Design a protein with these regions (language model features):
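Extended, subdomain-level signal for the structured scaffold at the beginning of enzyme domains
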Residues: 1-97
């Protein structure tokens, strides 16, 4: 199984996340059989994330200093876009990142 992490940060755009969950979700249903086993999970430094236009998301996995090495097990890391600079660069300053 391939594992893909989508990193959520304050100000992320919902449609930028949806494109990945939709593509890989449909791939698991109608894609070529040898590529169907993909698991997508959302990760962040905190449980609740506020999106650009007021939506709120809950991360499936929370990154902490104690478990940061577990996140090296993902096969790919997706960093979706946000409005302007959003707050990705604030999260980028997090010493865990």
């Amino acid at each position: 199984m391939k594992r893909i992490a989508i990193f959520l940060f304050e100000g992320v755009e919902l449609f930028e996340i949806a494109s990945f969950t939709d593509i890989f979700g449909w791939n698991n249903v109608v894609g070529l059989k040898e590529f169907r086993d993909i698991k997508v999970e959302t990760i962040s430094y905190k449980e609740s994330i506020k999106c650009t236009w007021g939506g709120e998301l809950r991360a499936e996995k929370i990154i902490t200093e104690d478990n940061v090495e577990n996140f090296y097990e993902y096969d790919a890391l997706v960093i979706p876009g946000g409005f302007g600079k959003a707050n990705f660069f604030k999260d980028n300053d997090n010493k865990i990142f």
